[in-house]
Amino acid sequence: MSKKLGNNSKKIAFVHPDLGIGGAERLVVDAAVGLQELENEVTIYTSHCDKKHCFEEVSSNLLDVEVYGDFFPTNVLKRFHILFAIIRQFYLVLALIFTGKIKQYDYFIVDQLSFCIPLLCCFSRPECKILFYCHFPDQLLALKGGFLKRFYRMPFDLIEEWTTGISDQIVVNSKFTKGIFHKTFKGLKNIEPGVIYPCVDLNSATDTEEDKLMDEEVNEFFKGGKFFLSVNRFERKKNIGLAIQSFAKFKAQLPKNVSEDNRIKPRLVVAGGFDPRVLENVEYLQELNGLSESLNLKCFTIRGKLLIIPPATDILFLPSIKSSLKKSLIKNAELLLYTPSFEHFGIVPVESMLFKTPVLSANNGGPLESIVHFTSDNIATATGYSQEPNDELWSKTMHTFYTELDEATKLKLGENGLTRVHELFSRHQMSEAFMQNLIQSNSKDEEKGILYGILKMWRIELLFVLISYYLVRLYK
């Protein structure tokens, strides 16, 4: 639970839409814990949090979490998601206004949805600063549609740009996202967002008893055989087919006495998030099975405990694996194949480097900032490969890594990865970056435009107070 630990501590509140177990939620939890470790008092406000489906730091009450507005629906007939997300966030902030909690904080950190920022600016203390963490512009994450969908989205996109721009400080998760920010929000060209990279838990590099047991299970299952690894959700945008096609061409380059000997041939393991209720997950796994068979690769799927694998298997699918198995697979893999293109950041390559496994990724998006491409003259710092997402190039890189690199070089790449994670992607580094950006927040009211000035007029404030009072009393 959050506690005030010193005279120099600040009161910091996060405003987040849905505190589940996604990547954005992992960042919020890590940032909150990190800022708490820096002797600040931290609270997370959210519209939804299921204590049975959240991160341990939340379920254990290490962090203070308060929920407002969970009774609102998230959609109607699977439509109007953005509208209801705004309504839920709007209600949350109105609750903070009515209860007076909004006046308690030195800083607010808002992420994903920026629509509440004007209210926070108007009703928080004059010296309070608002930081917005832009994982990616929401309008680019929305599913594309026809004219009516574009017409429906237009006001939300305009409001997103305006509300984002009136925050006191804006940060993004990578330099790549920073470039997308400038291309998307053309009206904010004078704003230069900071960059705060997501982090990984350095403590997870230390094996627990469960990890040791899982390592034994994995080693017994593969019986010393080598394997390449892909870890992604089973979604088409993750381009997992690239790993399968590259593996097929890599296998074709091996001598037949290796590629056809079931005792020593390398395999490809495709693991990741899978929900049988999500149609795309189910369809995509079927498509990947079909692709494997079309390339004359024998595939096998295991759900649950690793018990037995047919000796002839080339590709092993492991949908919906638990964290300890994911960790063990990464540690024991020859090379991690990270197939998505134009990822905003991409935490999986960083996790792989934490466990000293080199990475092969597409040469675009966020992974260009985490992976140091290996060339003949940078063995002191290289952590893997960044290549065009082309199966010919990838298969050649896999072949070079598998057949030409000695163990000392592979170990050095792994050690370099761990060093880079400690230098750039630790929770301490991230929380320090958040604190510095909060301290440097310096936007002034006169820089926020005429509309913001009108919003701050006392009549508008009174109207919002009355609305908040009515809604809170109505649904309390």
Curated annotation (Swiss-Prot):
Its main location: endoplasmic reticulum. The keyword Nucleus does not apply. Mannosylates Man(2)GlcNAc(2)-dolichol diphosphate and Man(1)GlcNAc(2)-dolichol diphosphate to form Man(3)GlcNAc(2)-dolichol diphosphate. One of its GO terms (biological process) is dolichol-linked oligosaccharide biosynthetic process. It is a multi-pass membrane protein. InterPro entries: ALG2, Glyco_trans_1, Glyco_trans_4-like_N. This is Alpha-1,3/1,6-mannosyltransferase ALG2. The keyword Transferase applies. Disulfide bonds: none annotated.
